[in-house]
């Protein structure tokens, strides 16, 4: 298991704060572990929480426009 996957597994099990009581999914990251850049969002929105994926809601659409 890579360090990245170990961190993901730790996040999936985390109950260190009250967010664990209200979240639907842990929103981790997607993409290559050896990517040259990483984009980190402030906090997942409702759509990200529902799907368990980062940047799929309105903020993600704005990010897509900004990166074009």
Predicted regions and their residues:
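A polyanion-binding, active-site-adjacent surface
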Residues: 1-68
């Amino acid at each position: 298991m890579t360090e990245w996957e170990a961190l993901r597994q730790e996040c999936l099990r985390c109950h260190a704060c009250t967010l664990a009581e209200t979240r639907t999914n842990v929103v981790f990251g997607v993409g290559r572990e050896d990517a040259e850049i990483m984009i980190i969002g402030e906090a997942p929105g409702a759509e990200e929480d529902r799907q368990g994926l980062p940047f799929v809601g309105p903020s993600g659409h704005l990010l897509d426009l900004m990166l074009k």
